[in-house]
Amino acid sequence: MATEQTAITRATFDEVILPVYAPADFIPVKGKGSRVWDQQGKEYIDFAGGIAVTALGHCHPALVEALKSQGETLWHTSNVFTNEPALRLGRKLIDATFAERVLFMNSGTEANETAFKLARHYACVRHSPFKTKIIAFHNAFHGRSLFTVSVGGQPKYSDGFGPKPADIIHVPFNDLHAVKAVMDDHTCAVVVEPIQGEGGVQAATPEFLKGLRDLCDEHQALLVFDEVQCGMGRTGDLFAYMHYGVTPDILTSAKALGGGFPVSAMLTTQEIASAFHVGSHGSTYGGNPLACAVAGAAFDIINTPEVLQGIHTKRQQFVQHLQAIDEQFDIFSDIRGMGLLIGAELKPKYKGRARDFLYAGAEAGVMVLNAGADVMRFAPSLVVEEADIHEGMQRFAQAVGKVVA
């Protein structure tokens, strides 16, 4: 006998979900390309991309087909067995990057947890049990587990949970002298986002990343690139390290890797990977067939000249619209980022009001992000159409006008 479903509203969230999020007042129920519709049928243009996740937009036909096909074949085996989609995806990632080995997980946090554990374990077994220092950066974000949130340089996320993992040092981003001051032979790894996403869409300078590479080589430390947000085509290269010409020892990927399906990966060399053995790390769901089938389909589309080269043109269109908005309303002190990870910093008179612009955008029918209290962030689909860019930015301009009026 069928049971009538209880009506779901935004109030339901407050009744059943832990209060760790503050979601919008509307509930999206359908998406197609760069358009989203809520329960009331209102349409939005999506420049948030699920926080840089839906790299091919919503319900891309190739990803839907991959999900349906795999869903009718094999869902889950655990890592007591391997599976074909995981091996295919692993081969694609290795063939396209510096890496020789890959390990799949389910989220950016898990990929980074894996990377940090591997970096410390490698240093302990190859060098010294006292080689455990991790150097990371203020305003970084690497995840929400106790280890990853401690490596992230934001006390607002890491404080209040008791003792933190030890031997983690934070220094200013893009400050090579600060790194040199704390770098020594006890350092096992330097962990960096080539572009700090949550930290305000701040891109590393080429000199900074090259300097980190040299320091790591000098002190036999591993260079770890967290490309969870800036990887998988977001910058216009498949991974940001390719743009900089600086090769890390370990790289993490998530978000856009699955195009909306939860999956992540840690990539490294055979030499570093060999420090792990059976049982050193693991995941019940990591590399499951459903996730890897969808990620494989996403990879095949993103890693093409058509998509990657188009990102630079699309970025310029966004920047031109933001510049026009600034000329009209005088609200931005800086427009920055790389590819389709774009930050627009608010001028001092609008300091702390990024979420006001975000909410006004939603009211006007455009979904955008903030990166801290002072920066608007745009992370749209990598294949967003020009017409959607134009219309969405017109809506955002209307929203800005209402906030500053």
Curated annotation (Swiss-Prot):
The modification N6-(pyridoxal phosphate)lysine is found at residue 255. Homodimer. Its cofactor is pyridoxal 5'-phosphate. Pathway: Amino-acid biosynthesis; L-arginine biosynthesis; N(2)-acetyl-L-ornithine from L-glutamate: step 4/4; Amino-acid biosynthesis; L-lysine biosynthesis via DAP pathway; LL-2,6-diaminopimelate from (S)-tetrahydrodipicolinate (succinylase route): step 2/3. The keyword Ubl conjugation does not apply. Involved in both the arginine and lysine biosynthetic pathways. N(2)-acetyl-L-ornithine binds at residues 144, 283. Pyridoxal 5'-phosphate binds at residues 108-109, 141, 226-229, 284. It is an enzyme of class 2 (transferase). It comes from the Bacteria. It holds the Pfam family Aminotran_3. Its main location: cytoplasm. It comes from Salmonella typhimurium (strain LT2 / SGSC1412 / ATCC 700720). This is Acetylornithine/succinyldiaminopimelate aminotransferase. Its EC number is 2.6.1.11, 2.6.1.17.
